[in-house]
């Protein structure tokens, strides 16, 4: 029903658009995505909270596109109703496929890709965020967010874990909450969800970055978490060699290695517990154990 409603909305706001082919992706947490004619992408927010973020995303991308040329970004436009309320967002389809769809990723870990990613992050993290704050950009990943995550882990996952694993996770979070390196940093605009699903590749070259829904003002180290977890520490270090940030790289990498680059596993396990039957939690913990021993 919602798919039909959204397609009707596209027809209402784009009456001259001839629709020959439609692809729908409803798997994301934030948007239903409709791709028309392999050419136009329409993103419909699933909640009011996500709807409120659309104008910030539009403004951010407009500013970023002025200074980033190596990597393609969505030419994002928010479509509003006659009362000025955002209905959906649209942009021209970007070529490439997400890294997550590629089985063998070693060819992606080139100096060229590392530099392209580093240049993108250097530009993003150096943006003046005060104009975006006026539009509503804030910090979601605050202390309360991480406390809530830990409580969920303790209440939901601990019963499946060994005593050593539980103690190590407690130590991981205790260090995060009490180590000054996690509070004394220079905040910047971050992407907030820079995983292998949101980085586009074509012919083994990074060509685009999408989905800025989780953009916020936070620790720039967080944006390296996906690379660390999905593509490994070595490639993350390679990116950092080309990165120009506001602080000491060793301090930033410490935060990636000892918390941000590890925490994606908890979201994965919680998601699987809720949505996947008969999965082995120790299969996930094997990778966790390996990363913690590095």
Where are these regions (language model features)?
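Short glycine/proline-enriched coil/turn segments at helix->beta-strand junctions
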Residues: 18-19, 36-40, 69, 203-204, ...
């Amino acid at each position: 029903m919602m798919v039909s409603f959204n397609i009707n909305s596209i027809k209402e706001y784009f009456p001259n658009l001839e629709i020959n082919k439609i692809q729908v992706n409803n798997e994301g947490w934030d948007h239903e995505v409709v791709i028309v004619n392999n050419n136009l992408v329409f993103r419909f927010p699933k909640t009011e909270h996500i709807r409120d973020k659309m104008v910030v995303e539009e403004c951010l991308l407009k500013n970023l596109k002025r200074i980033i040329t190596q990597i393609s970004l969505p030419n994002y436009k928010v479509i509003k109703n006659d009362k000025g309320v955002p209905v959906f967002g649209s942009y021209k389809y970007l070529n490439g496929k997400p890294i997550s769809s590629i089985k063998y990723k070693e060819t992606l870990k080139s100096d060229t890709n590392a530099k392209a990613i580093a240049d993108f992050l250097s530009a993003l993290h150096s943006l003046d965020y005060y104009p975006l704050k006026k539009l509503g950009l804030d910090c979601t990943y605050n202390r309360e967010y991480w406390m809530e995550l830990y409580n969920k882990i303790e209440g939901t996952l601990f019963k499946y874990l060994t005593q050593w694993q539980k103690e190590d996770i407690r130590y991981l979070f205790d260090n995060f909450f009490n180590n000054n390196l996690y509070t004394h940093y220079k905040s910047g605009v971050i992407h907030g969800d820079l995983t292998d699903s949101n980085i586009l590749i074509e012919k083994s070259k990074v060509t685009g970055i999408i989905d800025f829904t989780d953009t916020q003002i936070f620790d720039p180290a967080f944006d390296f978490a996906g690379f660390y977890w999905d593509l490994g520490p070595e490639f993350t270090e390679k990116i950092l060699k080309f990165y120009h940030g506001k602080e000491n790289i060793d301090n930033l990498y410490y935060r990636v290695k000892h918390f941000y680059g590890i925490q994606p596993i908890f979201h994965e396990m919680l998601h699987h517990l809720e949505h996947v039957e008969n999965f082995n939690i120790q299969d996930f913990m094997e990778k966790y154990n390996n990363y913690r021993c590095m």
